[in-house]
Structure formats: C-alpha cells, structure tokens
Amino acid sequence: MALEKSLETGDGQEKVRKQTAVYVYEAPLRLWHWVTALSIVVLGVTGYFIGAPLPTMPGEAMDNYLMGYIRFAHFAAGYVLAIGFLGRVYWAFVGNHHARELFLVPVHRKAWWKELWHEVRWYLFLEKTPKKYIGHNPLGQLAMFCFFVVGAVFMSVTGFALYAEGLGRDSWADRLFGWVIPLFGQSQDVHTWHHLGMWYLVVFVMVHVYLAVREDIVSRQSLISTMVGGWRMFKDDRPD
C-alpha cells in the first residue's frame, strides 16, 4: 500500500512520514532473493543447452562428459529453487508483513486497483510523479505473483515430473509428480511446456531487472540497495 496508508495516525504518523529510511526486507528474505536469482540463471543457461545440445564433441565419448555436467548443474539448481521456494513460503508465515506481499495480492480492494492503474501510467511515462511504497508497489506485486510465483511452481512441477522419468517408477519424484505427464498427455508435451516456461521466466527476469534499475534511478525510493541491505531509502519526506 502507499506509504501514508500503512502508517499510524496523529503525531506519530507525521513523524514516520518524514522518515527517509524504513527496514523492510529481513536477512532470510534477501538471501533467498539472491540465491533464487542465481539458480534461475543456472537453470536458464543449462536448460537451453539441454533443449539444444552441442552438435558434436571431439574425441572419445568416455572423455567428454560436458552434457552430463550441464544436466547435473540443472538438477542441482532445480533443487535449490524448489527448496528455496518452500523456505520462502515458510518465511511468509514467520517473517514481517512485507514477507507476505509476494503471495497475498489484495485484488478485492478498490484502492489497490486505483494505485495499480497509477503505476501502469507511471511506467508508461504518463504520470509525472510516482507514489511512495514501503513494500512492493501494486504493479510489482501483481507481476511478482503472476510471473514468479506461478512460473516457479509450474517449472518446479513440470521439471520434477521429467526428473522422475530418470529416477524411475516408485521413486519419490514419481510418487509426487507422476500425475503430471498423464495430465499433459505425453512426456514430449511436458518437455515442450517446460521449455516454453523457461522463456516465460527469461522475459520476467529481463523486465524485472530493467524496472528495478529504472525505479532505483527515477522513483522516490531505493530498490536494488533495499534487497541488499534491507532498508528502503526515500529520496524525500513527502508522505505520498
């Protein structure tokens, strides 16, 4: 929510309104963000080569295990992403209220939709002045849920379903995700959707990085440094 709507009333509100720094993101959340970012990069690069392997390798096959290393890195990064996501869900329950913004999008609030439209206009350079937000702005919150949360769940489910094929029947992955391939129809369909999901996340990462840098420069609060140190730094003391 906007800054002035998330603080106390009276003299206390005026005092907080003029703060130029608020502690937002706790250490476990920041660590999860950067570990997840690294795992997505590894998954994207290795997944690309798994989908489009190198045409040939010189020498004897026994001396060239490059694709084996690529697959191992992909599987390891997949575990990191999935376990980290489960940890992130846990932290939504035990962390501060900003830790829950990723999962709880207040679509039932009219004010949220109004602020969402303001953010859309701001990103399209149709608004002169942006609003101030302690946590995610409405557009960022919606994008994180639709692209990251939905995307990460989809990629984890389809990825472990394909991983279960290698582990074999009655493996833990087959027991948990064996229903996925029959749902899609066949293994190749899951491969295709998993591959398309990679590009879905690639687009998200590109837009996310661009907007984070843009907002750090032209908005009224910090973004990148906030995810490093946890503090939201404001460039002015106006309330909204």
From Swiss-Prot:
Write down the Gene3D superfamilies for this protein, in alphabetical order: Transmembrane di-heme cytochromes, Chain C
Question: Membrane topology for this entry?
Answer: Multi-pass membrane protein
Q: Which GO terms describe its molecular function?
A: electron transfer activity; heme binding; iron ion binding
Q: Keyword Membrane, does the record have it?
A: yes
Q: Which domain of life is it from?
A: Bacteria
Q: Which residues form the signal peptide?
A: none
Q: What is its main location?
A: membrane
Subcellular localization: Cell membrane
- Residues crossing the lipid bilayer are 31-51, 75-95, 142-163, 196-213
Q: Name one GO biological process term.
A: respiratory electron transport chain
Gene Ontology cellular component terms for the protein in this record: plasma membrane
Q: Does this UniProt record's set of keywords contain Electron transport?
A: yes
Q: Which keywords describe this protein according to UniProt?
A: Cell membrane, Electron transport, Heme, Iron, Membrane, Metal-binding, Transmembrane, Transmembrane helix, Transport
Per the record, the similarity remark reads: Belongs to the HupC/HyaC/HydC family.
Report the function annotation for this chain: Probable b-type cytochrome.
* This protein's name: Probable Ni/Fe-hydrogenase B-type cytochrome subunit
Gene source species: Azotobacter vinelandii
Tell me the gene name: hoxZ
